[in-house]
């Protein structure tokens, strides 16, 4: 039987592109882990993707996860667009390689290890975990330490 995990994520970016960060909370029963990191030059969409990726990569065993995200870009991507992108060799309807390909492929790989229920939440509406992830992401963006190698490609 798979462990049931709750994951909350958010991304932030100043300038878009500019310094950015992500925040994530992983919850299993009464245990909770927070994680965040900041990047020198990135975009908001990349940080939203990174939050989900890193949170899922923390899971050591296959789990059943409910992932709460406030990014419509990520939510639409994982529940709708990714199937056609993969079918068309990661190209969009204009036959161009999709943006953030490196992260979408990474999310696809890690997502296939788990049973995931994606849930969109409206940002800045008092959802406590989303507000905390937003805070973690903003603080990380204010103190960036890492280079987003994929953004520079």
Curated annotation (Swiss-Prot):
Record EC number: 3.1.26.4
Binding site for Mg(2+) 2: 10, 134
Metal-binding in keyword set: yes
Residues noted as binding Mg(2+) 1 in the record, renumbered to the chain: 10, 48, 70
Cofactor note: Binds 1 Mg(2+) ion per subunit. May bind a second metal ion at a regulatory site, or after substrate binding.
Catalytic activity reported: Endonucleolytic cleavage to 5'-phosphomonoester
InterPro entries: RNase_H (IPR050092), RNaseH-like_sf (IPR012337), RNaseH_domain (IPR002156), RNaseH_sf (IPR036397), RNaseHI (IPR022892)
Record-linked CDD domains: RNase_HI_prokaryote_like
Keyword annotations of the record: Cytoplasm, Endonuclease, Hydrolase, Magnesium, Metal-binding, Nuclease
Known cofactor(s): Mg(2+)
Domain RNase H type-1 intervals: 1-142
Pfam families cross-referenced by the UniProt entry: RNase_H
Cell compartment(s), UniProt: Cytoplasm
Main localization of the protein described in the UniProt heading: cytoplasm
MF-aspect GO terms: magnesium ion binding; nucleic acid binding; RNA-DNA hybrid ribonuclease activity
GO cellular component: cytoplasm
PROSITE patterns: RNASE_H_1 (PS50879)
Domain of life: Bacteria
Root EC class: hydrolase
GO BP term, example: DNA replication, removal of RNA primer
General function of this protein: Endonuclease that specifically degrades the RNA of RNA-DNA hybrids.
Description of how the protein assembles with itself and partners: Monomer.
Family, per entry: Belongs to the RNase H family.
Name assigned to this protein: Ribonuclease H
Taxonomic source organism: Baumannia cicadellinicola subsp. Homalodisca coagulata
Gene: rnhA
